[in-house]
Structure formats: structure tokens, C-alpha cells
């Protein structure tokens, strides 16, 4: 977001005005849309709204995660008034914007929803559509992907916003109209995108989309970056925080968590059970495929580390900081909250168990300095940075208690506190002397080099799988 000149009024920064002008230039050139790919924390919401406000169309549709709705409302309220008629809807409710031609003969709710997503038509048309966190529609066969693409196809201009557009080139098919000039419509767009992938000789674009394949390589990444952001016919704009004058670079650090004797024994037993479930003991050499086993191992390991993470967080709090803790599991969130509140700290939680209103109230309390710690499970669309609100001027740190096996998710998490020109050191916690130490080293190395372009996410997961296979 931008700085506040007075309560409720935002003053855009130069880089946000630059993004606004780039979007408007695409509109003037009669392009079908624009990809705003700035990294998290650079204020994409205000940049997009500035552009939308300057357009002549009055009816605007904004599609975003549920957690981002308060941010959009606040941005619109804190900007100069317009006569725009704005509809804001979260991804899960986009199906309500379509209607079937006739009555469905399907029996189950899921089947009816699938039919609606595939064959439904928009109840009305919005000339300007904004899709925030657009990577959510990268699967063209998903219900949200089908619905959002129809709404975008019916629009005159669509702004796609995402710091992490896709894991691999073929997941960028939702940008087909921008990249190929294809006629609007799911089939025409997919056909044109398939042809483009073949012309660029990127991966295997044959048959059904889910069967498309790609081996990560630098040549393809560079070619796709040129198409997206760098060439004369680039369809979007992407900047990193360090490229903005005066903005701090992301600082990452490893935070080893020491386990006590009982914790070590419990962790080792959990690790042995995990490998046994995957068939990695007793001479078996098959590749790990047990998603459920992996989830159980990570959940148990997460709980085992809670005491150590709480000790580390308390050190940061004792130094006068506020701390945001990213976790993957509700049980871990509850355990950390119990430990830290039991030590006298003011703790709040943001997760799926609470309503959007309750989560926003918790976020605001943290931003005003009324909470010392906030523990969150979401990976996107919330602002937890220093200086957003009065009373929230303490230095911030972000502790990633649960390492995600996705560079895209981790980059989204990093932008919760390190944003809007405010620095927050990001600590990646791991159990010292365990396989987590090697995984953490892989992740932090990859994140340091990641440009957010296609391929990094899948390559990171492959590296982690190899680490699990090779660990003793």
C-alpha cells in the first residue's frame, strides 16, 4: 500500500504511478488486459485501483481471495471518490455470477457446480475485471478457472495480479489472450496457447492439459520472462522490492531450533515411521508417493518444535519487536498461542476457524501494536508490516515455523511483513541436526535466487524429495 498523508487517504508512490500508467497504456493500445506481477509488498492493490479509477467504464468486477476483501475496501475508501459501481467477490463465490441455460439434471451439488462452471453464462457483463492473486485460476479445468476465464472473456479489459503467476509455463494459459491475441473464449484461448508452447518448443503441450509436461530449464524461463515482462511486446510489469529506490532487500536467515532429549527421541521415532510408511527402509528404493504420510510427518514434527520456536520468538519479543509466525497446521497455531500467552505475551491468531471479520479485527489489533504476536495459517492477502497504522511502529520479524515445500507459497508468506518499504527479517525455523536442516538450506538458497518465474516451484519440490530419499 502507499503511505498515508492523513487517516484514510493514500498517496501513491512513484512506482505505483508507473504501474498505473503501464496498465493504462495497455488499455489505450486496445489490449485485452495486463499482468501486474510486482513482488509481494509493492502495493499492487493501489496500483490497479489507480488505473481502474482513471478508466471511463463505470462497472467494475474485482475477484480476489476472501482475506483480501478488507484490503480492497480500504484501498477504495482511502482513494479519491469515483462514480464507479464496484462488485467485489471472492473466488469461492464466483459461480454465483453464472447461470445455466435451462435446468440442470445433475443430482449432486458437485456435479451441478461442475456443469455450471463448464456451460454457464455470465448473468451480467462487467467491462473491467480485476483478478487478484490470478495464479489461483492457472488450472483451466478447475471450477474457479473456468468461471473466471468466462468473466474475463466477456470483459473489455482484465487486470491480472500475481507475484507468482505459475509454477510452470503451461500454467500461464489464463494469460493466453494477452500472449497470443486469441479470440475470447476458453477453447480458442487454450488452442492458441497450445500452439504458442509448441512454437516456443517449451515442454510437451499434447493431449489434455493435465498431461502437459515440462522439465525446468533456464532457456525456457528466460524465453517466458521475455514474453511476460521484458520484451517490446511484454504483457505485464514486474519489479522486486530492491529495485524500488530506498526499499530494503529481503533478508532471510536460518533459525535452528534445539530439541531437548525427549524431543529428539520423539522426532527420530516420527522420522523412522515416516520412512517406513514410504517404503524407504528394508532395501526398498521406490520413490516417495505417500502424500498422507508426508503430511503426518510434517504435522508431528511441527508440534515437536513448538517449545523451541516459542523460545526463539520470546528472544525477539524481549528485544522490543513484534513477531508474526507462519504455521501450516491449526494444532500448531493453538499450541504456540498457549505457550506464548502463558509466558505473558498478547497473542492473536488468523486462520480458517475464524470469520473474516474476526480475522481482520485480529490483524488490525496487531497492526496497532495491541498484540505482540500474531500466528497465521494463510499464505496471501494480509498485511502485517510495520507502520501501517498508528501504534504499529515496533520493528517486525516473521518466523516461518512450518517450511512449505513450495517456493510460490513461501514467496507469498514472505510478503506479509516485508512490504510497503518496511523491512522485516524472515527467519526459517528448523529442528537442528535433522533432515529439516538440509531442507531449510535448500529452500533459502532457492528463494534467494528465485525470480518468481515458472519452474522454480517444481524444481524446489524435486530437491526436497531427493533430500528425504538420501537422508539416513
Pin down the residues of each PLM region:
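Conserved RecA-like helicase motor core of SF1/SF2 enzymes
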Residues: 379-412, 416, 420
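A conserved SF2-helicase RecA2
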Residues: 405-472
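Conserved Walker A/P-loop ATP-binding site and its immediately adjacent core
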Residues: 45-77, 166-171, 328-331
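Conserved helicase/translocase motor-coupling segment
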Residues: 242-346
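Conserved pre-motif I regulatory segment
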Residues: 1-35
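Conserved P-loop NTPase motor "coupling/switch" region that bridges the ATPase
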Residues: 128, 145-244, 422-423
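Conserved helicase ATPase core of P-loop NTP-dependent helicases/translocases
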Residues: 322-326, 335, 341-378
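Walker A/P-loop
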Residues: 30-51
Amino acid at each position: 500500500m502507499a503511505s498515508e498523508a492523513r487517516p484514510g487517504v493514500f498517496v501513491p508512490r512513484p512506482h505505483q504511478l508507473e504501474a498505473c500508467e503501464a496498465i493504462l497504456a495497455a488499455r489505450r493500445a486496445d489490449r485485452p488486459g495486463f499482468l501486474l506481477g510486482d513482488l509481494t509488498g509493492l502495493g499492487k492493490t493501489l496500483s490497479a485501483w489507480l488505473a481502474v479509477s482513471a478508466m471511463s467504464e463505470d462497472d467494475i468486477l474485482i475477484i480476489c481471495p476472501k482475506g483480501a476483501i478488507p484490503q480492497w475496501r480500504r484501498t477504495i475508501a482511502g482513494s479519491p471518490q469515483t462514480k464507479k459501481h464496484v462488485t467485489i467477490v471472492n473466488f469461492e463465490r464466483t459461480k454465483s455470477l453464472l447461470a445455466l441455460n435451462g435446468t440442470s439434471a445433475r443430482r449432486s451439488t458437485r456435479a451441478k457446480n461442475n456443469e455450471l462452471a463448464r456451460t454457464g453464462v455470465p448473468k451480467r457483463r462487467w467491462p473491467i475485471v480485476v483478478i487478484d492473486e490470478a495464479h489461483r485460476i492457472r488450472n483451466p479445468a478447475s471450477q474457479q478457472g473456468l468461471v473466471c476465464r468466462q468473466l474475463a472473456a466477456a470483459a473489455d479489459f482484465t487486470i491480472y495480479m500475481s507475484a507468482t503467476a505459475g509454477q510452470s509455463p503451461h500454467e500461464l494459459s489464463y494469460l493466453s489472450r494477452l500472449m497470443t491475441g486469441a479470440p475470447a473464449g476458453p477453447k480458442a484461448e487454450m488452442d492458441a496457447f497450445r500452439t504458442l508452447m509448441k512454437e516456443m518448443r517449451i515442454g510437451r503441450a499434447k493431449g489434455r492439459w493435465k498431461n502437459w509436461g515440462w522439465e525446468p530449464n533456464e532457456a525456457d524461463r528466460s524465453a517466458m520472462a521475455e514474453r511476460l515482462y521484458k520484451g517490446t511486446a511484454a504483457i505485464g510489469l514486474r519489479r522486486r522490492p530492491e529495485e524500488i529506490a530506498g526499499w530494503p532487500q529481503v533478508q532471510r536467515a536460518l533459525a535452528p531450533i534445539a530439541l531437548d532429549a525427549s524431543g529428539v527421541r520423539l522426532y527420530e521415532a516420527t522420522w523412522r515411521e515416516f520412512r517406513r510408511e514410504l517404503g524407504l527402509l528394508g532395501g526398498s528404493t521406490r520413490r516417495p508417493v505417500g502424500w498422507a504420510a508426508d503430511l503426518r510427518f510434517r504435522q508431528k514434527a511441527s508440534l515437536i518444535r513448538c517449545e523451541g520456536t516459542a523460545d526463539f520468538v520470546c528472544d525477539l519479543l524481549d528485544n522490543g519487536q513484534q513477531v508474526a509466525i507462519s504455521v501450516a497446521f491449526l494444532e500448531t497455531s493453538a499450541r504456540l498461542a498457549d505457550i506464548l500467552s502463558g509466558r505473558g505475551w498478547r497473542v492473536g491468531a488468523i486462520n480458517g476457524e475464524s470469520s473474516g471479520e474476526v480475522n481482520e479485527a485480529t490483524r488490525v489489533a496487531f497492526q496497532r501494536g495491541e498484540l505482540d504476536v500474531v500466528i497465521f495459517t494463510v499464505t496471501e492477502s494480509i498485511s502485517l508490516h510495520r507502520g501501517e497504522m498508528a501504534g504499529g511502529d515496533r520493528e517486525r520479524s516473521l518466523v516461518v515455523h512450518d517450511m512449505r515445500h513450495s517456493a510460490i507459497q513461501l514467496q507469498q508468506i514472505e510478503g506479509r511483513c516485508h512490504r510497503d518499504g518496511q523491512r522485516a527479517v524472515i527467519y526459517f525455523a528448523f529442528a537442528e541436526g535433522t533432515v529439516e536442516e538440509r531442507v531449510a538450506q535448500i529452500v533459502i538458497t532457492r528463494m534467494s535466487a528465485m525470480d518468481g518465474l515458472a519452474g522454480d516451484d517444481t524444481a524446489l519440490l524435486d530437491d526436497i524429495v531427493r533430500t528425504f530419499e538420501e537422508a539416513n
